[in-house]
Amino acid sequence: MNIHMKRKTIKNLSALENRMLMLDGMPAVRVKTELVESEQGSPNVHNYPDMEAVPLLLNNVKGEPPEDSLPVDHFQTQTEPVDLSINKARTSPTAASSSPVSMTASASSPSSTSTSSSSSSRPASSPTVITSVSSASSSSTVLSPGPLVASASGVGGQQFLHIIHPVPPSSPMNLQSNKLSHVHRIPVVVQSVPVVYTAVRSPGNVNNTIVVPLLEDGRSHGKAQMEPRGLSPRQSKSDSDDDDLPNVTLDSVNETGSTALSIARAVQEVHPSPVSRVRGNRMNNQKFACSISPFSIESTRRQRRSESPDSRKRRIHRCDFEGCNKVYTKSSHLKAHRRTHTGEKPYKCTWEGCTWKFARSDELTRHYRKHTGVKPFKCADCDRSFSRSDHLALHRRRHMLV
């Protein structure tokens, strides 16, 4: 009796190897085993330890896939052992396609491995179907954490235990990585995996940063009350149209010196650079603006008054002729004065028949008005007009004395 059963078992194993429907590396295999009719009532079903000691792994069996609709996944292998005792004699090809269950792959957990290994050693009275289902729509659905799902009905009124294995493309990490490019979308929430919201930073992405009001907003509202006379040069320029700014022309450089110009440039260069980087609420911006603006118009004016003794020596243009101690603040005035010592008169009158020459251009302009009769300076109190501004000033003094 035992020899006959062993021979029959060897035949069943060879038939099972020929009908095993799985390629190496494919994740989904449906196997249904049925009881042999002649051996359903045999009391010696589980008394073969030599057969149970050698489990057959599904990934070691190679065959041709029975269906074209099976999903091909090269990232998952099934390593659960299958109980190949003699009561599971043959595998029907109809059972492989009898009950396809569309289920969602669950997140991987340690309980799935232990449950699958324990299900392989169940009694022979309940046949087992090991499936791994992966669908294209599983990436957009909510994943369920339950590793074992038992169907209520099966073929011939028998229950089938479905062991669900996780599929890598539908894992929550891949779902989040696929949606990282769409920052405004919320990723799929998996019940068994906590979701950590992190800030994704990219060079071209501005929406991820928190926009807070800059110092420019607080400067235009509250800084005028806190510093009414100490506004920065850039703010006073936009409000008062250069009324409070020091003159930085060539004439003012000669009069007030290059130190005031360097201070004004230092105010414009140093002041806005840390201001544009400060972010916070409006009150902090106002306090910070008051603390980081040491240079103001009043401070530059005070420095200009206090620097007069030493700095004016650099701005003074002194005549170097013997016996002449005249001093000018402009180099053009000194050149015109030097012509009085040298006798040079480069400006000639172009009026026909006039041979007058002048050392200064303004003297030539005044002389030329005598020929033309132009009198641009008019008195506001009377109808008289003058060709020279100093003549008009003397005339207006007479009106004031009368």
From Swiss-Prot:
Cellular localisation: Nucleus
Database matches in InterPro entries: Znf_C2H2_sf, Znf_C2H2_type
Record PTM Phosphoserine, positions in chain: 202
Keyword line: DNA-binding, Metal-binding, Methylation, Nucleus, Phosphoprotein, Repeat, Repressor, Transcription, Transcription regulation, Zinc, Zinc-finger
A Pfam family it matches: zf-C2H2
Location of N6-methylated lysine modifications: 313
Disulfide partners: none
GO BP of this protein: negative regulation of transcription by RNA polymerase II; positive regulation of transcription by RNA polymerase II; regulation of DNA-templated transcription
Gene Ontology molecular-function annotations: DNA binding; DNA-binding transcription factor activity; DNA-binding transcription repressor activity, RNA polymerase II-specific; RNA polymerase II cis-regulatory region sequence-specific DNA binding; RNA polymerase II transcription regulatory region sequence-specific DNA binding; zinc ion binding
Annotated zinc fingers (C2H2-type), start-end: 317-341, 347-371, 377-399
SUPFAM superfamilies noted in UniProt: beta-beta-alpha zinc fingers
Gene3D superfamilies, A to Z: Classic Zinc Finger (3.30.160.60)
Composition skew (Low complexity), residue ranges: 89-144
Cell membrane found in the keyword field: no
Source organism, top-level taxon: Eukaryota
Region annotated Disordered, chain positions: 81-144, 219-254
Similarity comment: family membership: Belongs to the Sp1 C2H2-type zinc-finger protein family.
Comment text on domains: The 9aaTAD motif is a transactivation domain present in a large number of yeast and animal transcription factors. In KLF12, the motif is inactive.
PANTHER family membership: KRUEPPEL-LIKE FACTOR 12, KRUEPPEL-LIKE TRANSCRIPTION FACTOR
Job of this protein: Confers strong transcriptional repression to the AP-2-alpha gene. Binds to a regulatory element (A32) in the AP-2-alpha gene promoter.
Protein name: Krueppel-like factor 12
Naturally occurring in which organism (per UniProt): Mus musculus (Mouse)
Gene name as annotated: Klf12
